Amino acid sequence: MMMDEDVEQASLMSFNDRPRAFPNMRSKTYSPLIFRIIRKLNVRVLSIILLFCFGAIFYMGASTSPIIVFVFTVCIISFLLSIYLTKWVLAKDEGPPEMVEISDAIRDGAEGFFRTQYSTISKMAILLAFVILCIYLFRSLTPQQEAAGLGRAMSAYITVAAFLLGALCSGIAGYVGMWVSVRANVRVSSAARRSAREALQIAVRAGGFSALVVVGMAVIGIAILYSTFYVWLGVGSPGSMNVTDLPLLLVGYGFGASFVALFAQLGGGIYTKGADVGADLVGKVEQGIPEDDPRNPAVIADLVGDNVGDCAARGADLFESIAAEIISAMILGGTMAKKCKIEDPSGFILFPLVVHSFDLIISSIGILSIKGTRDASVKSPVEDPMAVLQKGYSLTIILAVITFGASTRWLLYTEQAPSAWFNFALCGLVGIITAYIFVWISKYYTDYKHEPVRTLALASSTGHGTNIIAGVSLGLESTALPVLTISVAIISAYWLGNTSGLVDENGIPTGGLFGTAVATMGMLSTAAYVLTMDMFGPIADNAGGIVEMSQQPESVREITDLLDAVGNTTKATTKGFAIGSAALASFLLFSAYMDEVSAFANVSFKEVDIAIPEVFVGGLLGAMLIFLFSAWACAAVGRTAQEVVNEVRRQFIERPGIMEYKEKPDYSRCVAIVASAALREMIKPGALAIASPIVVGLVFRILGYYTGQPLLGAKVVASMLMFATVCGILMALFLNTAGGAWDNAKKYIETGALGGKGSEAHKAAVTGDTVGDPFKDTAGPSIHVLIKMLATITLVMAPVFL
């Protein structure tokens, strides 16, 4: 798509003569305690502390493996690059004062909610850490842990420390996503007055900063834990723990990351969609005013929600995905290396860390490939922003194929099976292709350039009911291709792994599960660039809101509308990517759970027979959990939206001058209502997700004790996990795609199709968009986290079920 001259070269004229309805709400910027402490330190003291920390990290890495040193080096370089991207973005101008005022209010709202939300989450995390400590002090140990002298107390402290570190890193990942978004949005708005390309580049680099930090922290956090435990426990020395058993000590890290990600996604999703739905129902439908109009009392809450829901929550979500995938792959790699009696198993265990280190390198190249702004005096059309992002993604994919092949040859070559590395390289290629197909499928079903969304828009012309029917049917249909893709990927990767030539002492092939692990790594090998595209969406959305509220020329709004439409598509495609990776990661975690049960029970645990009534009931409970969780998440958005609607209606009735710009809306009141409701509503579905597998496992463990079935608790939980994963994948695909399609059908009509804004088709499309909001931004993304968190909970609690 090409943009016209008047879109590319927007007017810079001042609009100060237009009426405004916006108060200056700026207050002191919030930052977490750890950052405030660092700021107060003397520069020399801080430098010495950093040098000491880096020295300690590299010492532990050198004492562990040269591979860990490579991982540490890449992560630190990526952090330095992210600092460069931050400075580059913050060096851009913020535009006129009216833009800055709006941006400041959004920043205040986002940081205020973040502070309250994460304070609540941290208290719950500390309480859960205490529960885990008590449970682990009375749990059983694996024979290998007992032989290595690892007592219950030591095991408990290690798991709790890993849990708290995972929770902390996940929280920081969320904060980083929000921090950059609330500072980049106004700079994108300002750049849109000059050039669409400049606005695009700022949004991409801001998203890139967050992505590199999130992925880098996931990798370096696990690497630090691994090397610390390796040195501390004397792994590899006579009488100590075997290196192949070490990854089991890391499961707490994945659980901590999942715990924070779930509540971040729930709270952020309820906030953003409660505000969005409430603002749309009264503003667009009842009052007939445009989106992001300054007369709407809920508009600031809506814009704040983009940051806490789409940026902070998505950062924590992908952090958790990567952490869970790395840990499960390390467990499976260690198990396979032990079965095959590979002389140096470190390559198979540390392979996931190296893959994601290369991810940081190639994604950085992809981000920097989005070239700078042309001279503003050059009046020529530019490429479609989606095409620009797609070129960067294609470059990243090509580099991923090359680096993945090099990584497999470097780390997975073994004399026992000289060609095994090539089979695993093909497994990685399967994962990379799967990721690309998932992105394409999501784009096809949610981009208004393609038939499905246009058909949905056409259905809007005959009323609200036909819009809803068409959207639901589109969402249901959209599950078919992804499921077929996942099925082919799992079977292909398993077959390639099984035929790699790696066999156990009985000559039985053992590489199948590790092959699926490698495919999952391949799918996530471009995660940093995918997260960049995801972060681009809410930044562009916020920029459009700032432009609308500051009443900039229509040509500027056209640029931000275009970026916003592309952002909607990238958000939808990255959600497809996220659920695909969650599906493969959950399969890995399920396999890792079975390996862990085998290790603790000291008996083979390879099959789950659903013909056993209790096991079948566990599966039913898992499927039910997905539906009940989704219902509670959507209902939470509905209740929050009702509070917002009542407040906005009250303000319009009591302050009739708002519509004529004679009175200012009370924006802060809506922000407070949404924040309070989101924090209140996130507890119930979150508690359901955490308590369900633990309660089910304990109940059936007791039942198994009295019926002479010692592994019944573990089997029922395995069945619950299996069914919940299958139902969760399908439900998330339906919710994400239907919601994204409804949103872009509305955007398509707003471009002028089928009567444009204000038409009957547009009103029906707004209804569909309203229904789709909690689907795609609350329930759907939360299910991504839920199915992985169920797996990490079972990994941590597996000894309790025996």
Curated annotation (Swiss-Prot):
- Catalysis performed (reactions): diphosphate + H2O + H(+)(in) = 2 phosphate + 2 H(+)(out)
Provide the membrane topology annotation: Multi-pass membrane protein
Binding locations of substrate = 273, 776
- Tissue expression remark: Ubiquitous. Mostly expressed in cotyledons, roots and flowers. Especially high levels in trichomes, sepals and stamen filaments.
Annotated binding of Mg(2+) 4, by residue: 568, 743
GO CC, alphabetical: endosome; Golgi apparatus; Golgi cis cisterna; Golgi membrane; trans-Golgi network; vacuole
Per the record, the similarity remark reads:
Belongs to the H(+)-translocating pyrophosphatase (TC 3.A.10) family. K(+)-insensitive subfamily.
This chain's protein is named Pyrophosphate-energized membrane proton pump 2
- Source organism: Arabidopsis thaliana (Mouse-ear cress)
What is the organism lineage in this UniProt record? Answer: Eukaryota, Viridiplantae, Streptophyta, Embryophyta, Tracheophyta
